[in-house]
């Protein structure tokens, strides 16, 4: 996905914020989880970021209270989704697409909601020949009828840290699902109509 120098580097501080925020939040919510070493280093190297996150994630009366910077989070989710969709489906023009960004934290999701989110969608249509995703679907074939079905599996980039899935949605647009630290669940829909 091409990007000018300014655009590509303009996300750095937001990416650092989102990564550190999510890791610190996970450590605050889940006993037994210890934040990553690179998160601790980033926070010790950037006192302003450390203070900001300490202000946004607090333990009050035994409960974790937090307030994420939704603009930064949405901006990073959109950047990631555009990159994944462009990588998997080759060329997609996002310029005039309507975009819907949904996200929620694991501790706010029911088991049914997680299972629905985790579903592996069947691909009824395939992207253009030559795109990465046109050679990576999981194909199941009924040996009796010969009927074949294609499914889009999750791409696990870092185990328990980051994974994503790209597929055509029910409306004919492109959807990208992202899970970060097994804490943040996000779905970004692009209506390409």
Question: Each PLM stretch: what is its role?
Answer:
Residues 15-18, 27, 36, 46:
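Alpha-helix initiation and N-capping motif
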Residues 70-193:
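C-terminal, charged low-complexity interaction regions
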Residues 41-82:
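Short flanking/linker segments adjacent to small metal-binding domains or redox-active Cys/His motifs
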Residues 7, 22-37:
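A broadly used, surface-exposed interaction patch
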Residues 2-22:
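Short Cys/His-centered divalent metal-binding micro-motifs
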Residues 14-17, 51-64, 130-139:
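Hydrophobic transmembrane alpha-helix bundles
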Residues 1-2, 32-48:
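Short Fe-S-cluster ligation motifs
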């Amino acid at each position: 996905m091409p990007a000018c120098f300014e655009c590509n580097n303009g996300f750095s501080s937001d990416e650092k914020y989102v990564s550190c925020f999510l890791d610190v939040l996970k450590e605050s919510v889940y006993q037994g989880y210890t934040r990553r070493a690179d998160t601790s280093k980033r926070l010790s190297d950037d006192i302003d970021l450390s203070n900001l996150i300490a202000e946004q994630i607090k333990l009050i009366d035994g409960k974790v209270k937090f307030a994420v910077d939704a603009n930064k989070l949405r901006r990073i989710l959109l950047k990631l989704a555009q990159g994944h969709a462009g990588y998997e489906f080759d060329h997609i023009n996002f310029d005039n697409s309507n975009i819907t960004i949904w996200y929620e934290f694991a501790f706010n999701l029911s088991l049914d909601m997680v299972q629905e989110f985790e579903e592996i969608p069947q691909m009824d249509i395939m992207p253009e020949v030559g795109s990465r995703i046109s050679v990576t679907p999981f194909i199941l074939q009924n040996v009796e009828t010969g009927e074949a079905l294609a499914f889009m599996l999750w791409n696990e980039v870092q185990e328990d840290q980051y994974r994503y899935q790209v597929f055509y949605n029910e409306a004919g647009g492109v959807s990208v699902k992202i899970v970060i630290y097994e804490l943040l669940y996000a779905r970004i829909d692009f209506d390409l109509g």
